[in-house]
């Protein structure tokens, strides 16, 4: 592989992934893209994640394994893979998700035809057995053709609005030369929402982002998924990262982009307060819940929506 040009590097950050990794990596190896490599980064897993990866390596030399000495989260794992990658394009794949076989060929061919630095496609939620769950993530937007997304469009879809199909869940395919030339890396302080900040940074430094409406990424929906409910500590980290982003690009962000970031921050602050209040109620700490909502009344509406949504999901089971 070292003597051949590698078209794509598929990055799989893995933690406690021994039960799901094989299917994910096999979907990566099945990509009809020619020369590729799959880099699995074992994020100091306490299980057999590394062993499962070595079993895959024994069957297919395109699989590579990196191991981290201590758990650093998905950002640290992906950054390690970016440094080691040889592909012209970088594709992010979670260790319990899959891709349709033609996904990367379609996305990279399109990206090269328009000069994109990053391309998204839609994702299809599936159950742990790979069965589709409803419509695709962005089906309600009724996008029928490729779209170029400037930073304002991207931020519009990442405001943490109740019921919003957030663009931050989409998985990017990135031009590695642009990533390296601009020093783009995942924020290792984030355990949630790290993809948003990478793409926001790419756009802020002049990168070109396109969206393809075909759902080629299969997102596994699991109870207790980290992206299902937001830990208040993670929300605070996101707010800090948002403020740092705006400060870095204060001279280049448009007035509309700054307005959207302020709205995003208000919504995340509401979400964090609502989560704190819900946890307090569940623990029987009603005074703490009341105090949290009195300090941020706008979070009360968010809390009641979350409770109503949780009850609706229970009735549906």
Where in the sequence are the language-model features?
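C-terminal subregions of glycosyltransferases and related glycan-biosynthesis enzymes
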Residues: 3, 197, 204, 209-317
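Nucleotide-sugar donor-binding/catalytic module of glycosyltransferases
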Residues: 1-233, 311-314
């Amino acid at each position: 592989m070292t003597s051949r040009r590698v078209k794509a590097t598929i990055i799989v950050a893995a933690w406690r992934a021994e039960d799901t990794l094989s299917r994910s990596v096999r979907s990566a190896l099945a990509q009809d893209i020619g020369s590729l490599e799959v880099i699995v980064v074992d994020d100091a897993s306490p299980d057999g994640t590394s062993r499962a990866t070595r079993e895959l390596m024994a069957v297919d030399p395109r699989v590579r394994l990196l191991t981290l000495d201590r758990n650093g989260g998905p950002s640290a794992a992906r950054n390690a893979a970016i440094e080691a990658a040889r592909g012209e394009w970088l594709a992010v794949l979670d260790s319990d998700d899959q891709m349709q076989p033609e996904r990367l060929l379609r996305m990279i061919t399109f990206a090269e035809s328009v000069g994109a630095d990053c391309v998204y496609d839609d994702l299809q939620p599936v159950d742990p057995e790979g069965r589709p769950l409803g419509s695709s993530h962005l089906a309600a937007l009724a996008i029928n053709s490729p779209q170029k997304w400037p930073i304002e469009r991207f931020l519009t879809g990442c405001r943490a609005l109740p019921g919003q199909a957030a663009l931050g869940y989409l998985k990017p395919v990135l031009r590695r030369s642009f990533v390296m030339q601009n020093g783009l890396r995942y924020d290792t302080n984030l355990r949630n929402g790290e993809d948003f900040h990478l793409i926001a940074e790419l756009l802020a430094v002049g990168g070109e982002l396109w969206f393809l409406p075909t759902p080629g990424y299969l997102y596994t929906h699991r109870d207790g998924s980290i992206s299902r409910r937001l830990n208040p500590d993670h929300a605070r980290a996101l707010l800090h990262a948002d403020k740092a982003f705006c400060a870095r690009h204060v001279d280049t962000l448009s007035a509309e982009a700054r307005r959207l970031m302020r709205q995003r921050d208000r919504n995340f602050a509401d979400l964090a307060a609502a989560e704190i209040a819900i946890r307090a109620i569940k623990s029987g700490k009603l005074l703490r819940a009341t105090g949290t909502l009195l300090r941020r009344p706008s979070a009360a509406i968010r809390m009641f929506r979350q409770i109503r949504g949780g009850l609706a999901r229970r009735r549906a089971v």
